[in-house]
Amino acid sequence: VQPKQNILHLPVYQPGKPISEVKRELGLTDVIKLASNENPFGCSPKAKEAIVSLLDQVSIYPDGGAVDLTHAVAEHYGVKPNQIIFGAGSDEVILMIARAFLTPNDETISAFPTFPQYKHNAEIEGATFIEVPVDENGKHDLKAMLAKVNERTKIVWICNPNNPTGTMLSEREIVSFIESVPNHVMVVLDEAYAEYTVNEEYPDSISLLNKYKNIVVLRTFSKIYGLASLRIGFGIGHPDVVRSINQVREPFNTTSFAQKAGLAALQDHEFIRTCREANAAGIRQVTAELDKLGLPYFEAHGNFIMIDVKRPGQAVFQGLLQRGIIVRHDPGWGYPTKIRVTVGSEEQNRKFLEALEQVLSEVAVS
């Protein structure tokens, strides 16, 4: 049995190493994972209570339309319920957008490096994927991306803040780009890390939906809300666009646990505020030490920092791993001397910085 020709070259997604695997492989008892941009403070206590309340309903199918959560999200963001589509993580919404709109005759554009699932899902549909390198500061080169738009372009993907670089586009930049692309081009604004941003120039993208019908905004409960293992995220767009995405959505694609926990997490504003402030403090803590070490880094607007360690990134990754610190280095990013580290708690950040200084003394500068 032969698979589709256009998937033969596709890589299998490689997540950050799990803690249990590192403990087992290296015989360690104390391991800190700063590889997958998870919330170091977990999730809202209210979300935990919501999960426990459903334990006796495991045998019951979830609400296929996630009605309660849909209405809560609609109220939270000031949109209509028919503008919202849920997925098992926002990455499933990416999959559904590609499935609903891309054909082998289409082209689709993103920055490079960025979240790999845009390319992955576009190529499954046979579309031509065009990657435009970020600039020297790790930001989307919107002018160069716009130059690639033509009559075959169907979707432009913009990750903001961008993963893995952590950089941010302002509302002025986003609006200018949207107004420059033809109406037949969908602009997907992936804002998985939006709740972490404290920069006043960060776009209020959801309000832009009132003016632009060709944009879709993606959000997730996996990051600041701390529900990564439950897999739930959503897209907000024009009702006609959302209707098309819904047509390719699998039934019961989000669990009762995810829906109920998401509802509780959405309403715990104090938890989100605390996490946002702690993350901002963590960025200051880490970057202050990086400045002392003379290590460059991109501006961080999410909950992670991309650092130029001035040494082979894989060697630094391995050195940190031996000390029980899991970070991320991906040769596919095109940055051989850079690592990406999640901002942890104050103690986790301190242990990372101590380990990093030790590793830097052992690995030769490139």
Where are these regions (language model features)?
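N-terminal "arm"/small-domain region of PLP-dependent enzymes with the aminotransferase-like
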Residues: 1-60
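Short acidic capping loops at alpha-helix termini that bridge into adjacent secondary structure
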Residues: 30, 80-84, 104-107, 152, ...
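Phosphate-binding glycine-rich loop
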Residues: 59-107, 125
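PLP-dependent aminotransferase class I/II
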Residues: 65, 214-298
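PLP-dependent aminotransferase-like
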Residues: 100-158
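Active-site pre-lysine segment of PLP-dependent enzymes
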Residues: 123, 140-151, 164-187, 191-222
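Conserved PLP-binding catalytic core of the aspartate aminotransferase-like
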Residues: 280, 289-323
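PLP-dependent enzyme catalytic core of the Aspartate aminotransferase-like
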Residues: 319-323, 328, 332-366
